[in-house]
Amino acid sequence: MKIGIPREIKNNENRVGLSPSGVHALVESGHTVLVETNAGSGSFFEDVDYKEAGAEIVAEQAKVWDVDMVIKVKEPLESEYPYFKEGLVLFTYLHLANEEKLTQALIDRKVISIAYETVQLPDRSLPLLSPMSEVAGRMSAQVGAEFLQKLNGGMGILLGGVPGVPKGKVTIIGGGQAGTNAAKIALGLGADVTILDVNPKRLQQLDDLFGGRVHTIMSNPLNIELYVKQSDLVIGAVLIPGAKAPRLVTEDMIKQMKNGSVIIDIAIDQGGIFETTDKITTHDDPTYIKHGVVHYAVANMPGAVPRTSTLALNNATLPYALMLANKGYREAFKSNQPLSLGLNTYKGHVTNKGVAEAFEMEYKSVEEALQL
């Protein structure tokens, strides 16, 4: 199979679809890998590293897309849509439930798109989303602490406090991978941490994991309102695989927060859980203030720590990339149920129910689509 690794063009997206070691594994399996010039430089992988791994370095973006399978990190931007072609396998994060124009382009061009974030194991875990959820979760507490500083627009709160002064209050909505990792760092900074989740069993697990050092609260509108308004930092970490994130924090709740408090919306790439995160921000201009509250809504948080993120992502995605390349997509989907759940569009059809419902499009199961 011929595989392309393009350079990411999203604002300050410094990750790359495969590291040189991943490229080497594909080449050793008999595949041809094209890597766009400087695709890995943001993660401190140079062209010579890829060349030594067996890749062909190409300067033309169009050439790196003219392949059987493209492996990326983030969803394609509009300038990349013209490279879509029938039968192209696109393997990347997509978050299509918040990307109607991209969804339509994939359908129109009959692209076979596989979203990292919807590959799902029998225990409902998300193996290709998990590494970046860990990174984004850990970053969210660090970023929140930074923007609570007065010079960054915050109220001037030190999360850990000092003797005689209360700790900062951190509320995390969602106790999955991102929320759990946010709690780890917030606790490490010395904050007073509360996690809200809808699953009582998960709350019990979190209580055991943290040895009672975090407050675990059932997530419902009343409790969300109560804890949001008294928090210095609120982190939104709710995920419904493939679907838009629920708007759990209303504008009225935000209005009740203290001036200079901070919200971090990790779920912004799926639409966000805060009513007031009505726009996606970038690493160049990461925040805006609304109702006196600092809003951070960067959709590619792990792009700020690309070396760690690329290596972690490569560890997770490479086995699936090898499966697609070695077996071909049809056999790979048939032999691996978790991978088949990653299929979002197939030759003009939407094969993810959450995406179909988001845009009122016709849905076909993977099994139905593969028979066409």
From Swiss-Prot:
> Does Oxidoreductase show up as a keyword for this record?
yes
Q: Which InterPro entries match?
A: Ala_DH, Ala_DH/PNT_CS2, AlaDH/PNT_CS1, AlaDH/PNT_N, AlaDH/PNT_NAD(H)-bd, NAD(P)-bd_dom_sf
UniProt GO MF annotations? alanine dehydrogenase activity
Q: Which reaction does it catalyse?
A: L-alanine + NAD(+) + H2O = pyruvate + NH4(+) + NADH + H(+)
Q: Name the positions where NAD(+) binds.
A: 169-199
The alphabetized UniProt keywords are: NAD, Oxidoreductase
Pathway, per record: Amino-acid degradation; L-alanine degradation via dehydrogenase pathway; NH(3) and pyruvate from L-alanine: step 1/1
Q: Which residues form the active site?
A: 95
SUPFAM superfamilies per UniProt: Formate/glycerate dehydrogenase catalytic domain-like, NAD(P)-binding Rossmann-fold domains
What family does the Swiss-Prot or TrEMBL record give for this protein? Belongs to the AlaDH/PNT family.
Q: What is this protein called?
A: Alanine dehydrogenase 2
State the organism named in the record.
Staphylococcus aureus (strain NCTC 8325 / PS 47)
